Amino acid sequence: MVSHSHSHTHQNQKDIEKEKLLKERLDSIKYYETFINETLNVDLNKSIEDREKVLENLENYLELKSNIELLIENKMDSMKTMINLGSECYVKARVQDTSYIYVDIGLGIHVKYTLEEAIKFINEKETFLNKTVENQTKKINQIKTKIDLIQNGLKELKHLE
């Protein structure tokens, strides 16, 4: 009789241990799912947005560069253009002197350059922006790798019995 109740207590002890392990595992699963959703995915989306802005910036500089190269090639000392007044509302304009150009170098600061200086500046800016995109892509891939690793870990945690 005595030995029977002893094994019964032993079984309860095992059940309590099992219960405890299960609870810890569920807590871990919840913790890592929250970490993925509230931290990693947020970082990932922000990093992707940041990279998009840099790519857009790069595109604008490259467009400007090709326009400047056209001015130089065609030896245009004056030109007609359309100026965007905002909200896609344009007005015709005539540029009397194309030997100088004002380039937005960031933070709303415009610098007066000769066309050749502007090309030189844009080439440097292009190198910098390409490097930035490269770094942001690395960061995005690192975050994606972290998410994958944790998701694989979660899969294993969920399949443990």
UniProtKB/Swiss-Prot annotation:
Gene Ontology cellular component annotations, sorted alphabetically? chromatin; mediator complex
Which family is this sequence assigned to? Answer: Belongs to the UXT family.
| Pfam families xref list | Prefoldin
InterPro entries the UniProt entry points to: Prefoldin, Prefoldin_subunit_alpha, UXT
Q: What is this protein called?
A: Protein UXT homolog
Q: Which residues form a coiled coil?
A: none
One of the entry's Gene Ontology molecular-function terms is: transcription corepressor activity
GO BP term, example? negative regulation of transcription by RNA polymerase II
